[in-house]
């Protein structure tokens, strides 16, 4: 016979862990979807291109124990809109600052994967005082030609099955939304001003920065994060062996190490 008290406790615990606030914010002529989980000092989590807020689902329970998580969908991704059908990381940075201003959040910590990290790099140079510490995963300061070749080559028909299935799960607008995102993905190959951070420009970043990068990243070779590490004054570098252009999810062999390293970094133990 089931113990009703134990069952109730489990249900209450599950409800508390999964409690969230999901809303839309009017920012720069768009509806930006965001979720809030937990309480404490703010921690912003930014996903990669063609992904959505759902990429962070596996980490919500861990990070919401210590932080108030703000997890948005970048413009046109997931549930967010984008009437202009244009995407740059600089504009994305303005969107996120607009959202945080509406939420009356001044200082915050942040983690960004790929385009999320590029968005954070713009944010950290736009306003050097607001980001208390940031983690850049599989991010870059510029697009090398090898990356541009990949950006040019991708289209709706050529995307592999796993990638397509993930996009369909994360984007309620279906084929139309996905095609628009992939068009913007292609357009990045021809942009030379959005992601073009010189070493002197990177040196203006005042936020303590942890750079996490795989040594087998096909988009951004390892010399790029090494250069960023040398250029950003208070920075730390973790090169993950046998790891490609990917986030570290809960099923990764690096999941435990990731949680320990990020928590130590955010606690200020390394500074």
Would you name each region that the model predicts?
Residues 30-79:
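Conserved HGGG/HGGXW glycine-rich cap/lid loop of the alpha/beta-hydrolase fold
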Residues 49, 108, 112-114, 214:
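Conserved alpha/beta-hydrolase "nucleophile elbow" surrounding the catalytic nucleophile
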Residues 71-111:
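Active-site loop/oxyanion-hole signature of alpha/beta-hydrolase fold enzymes
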Residues 118-126, 132-164:
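Flexible "cap/lid" loop of the alpha/beta hydrolase fold
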Residues 184-201:
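Active-site nucleophile elbow and catalytic-triad environment of alpha/beta-hydrolase enzymes
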Residues 205, 211-213:
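Short beta-strand/loop motif that positions the catalytic acidic residue
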Residues 213-243, 249, 256:
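Conserved loop-alpha-helix segment in the C-terminal half of the alpha/beta-hydrolase fold
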Residues 241-271:
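Catalytic active-site module of serine/aspartate enzymes centered on a nucleophile-bearing elbow/loop
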């Amino acid at each position: 016979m089931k113990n009703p008290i134990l069952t109730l406790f489990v249900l209450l615990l599950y409800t508390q862990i999964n409690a969230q606030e999901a809303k839309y914010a009017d920012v720069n002529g768009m509806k930006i979807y965001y979720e809030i989980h937990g309480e404490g000092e703010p921690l912003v989590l930014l996903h990669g291109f063609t992904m959505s807020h759902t990429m962070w689902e596996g980490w919500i329970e861990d990070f919401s124990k210590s932080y108030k998580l703000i997890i948005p969908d970048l413009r046109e991704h997931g549930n967010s809109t984008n009437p202009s059908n244009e995407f740059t990381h600089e504009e994305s940075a303005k969107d996120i600052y607009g959202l945080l201003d509406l939420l009356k959040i001044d200082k915050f910590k942040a983690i960004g994967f790929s385009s999320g990290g590029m968005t954070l790099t713009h944010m950290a140079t736009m306003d050097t005082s607001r980001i208390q510490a940031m983690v850049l995963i599989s991010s870059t300061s510029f697009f090398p030609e090898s990356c541009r070749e990949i950006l040019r080559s991708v289209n709706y028909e050529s995307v592999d099955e796993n990638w397509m299935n993930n996009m369909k799960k994360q984007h309620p607008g279906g084929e139309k939304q996905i095609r628009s995102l992939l068009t913007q993905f292609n357009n990045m190959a021809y942009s030379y001003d959005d992601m073009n951070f010189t070493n002197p420009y990177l040196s203006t970043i005042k936020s303590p920065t942890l750079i996490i990068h795989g040594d087998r990243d096909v988009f951004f070779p390892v010399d790029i994060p090494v250069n960023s590490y040398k250029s950003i004054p208070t920075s730390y570098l973790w090169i993950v062996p046998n790891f490609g252009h990917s986030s570290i999810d809960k099923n990764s062999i690096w999941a435990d190490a990731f949680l320990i390293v990020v928590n130590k970094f955010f606690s200020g133990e390394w500074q």
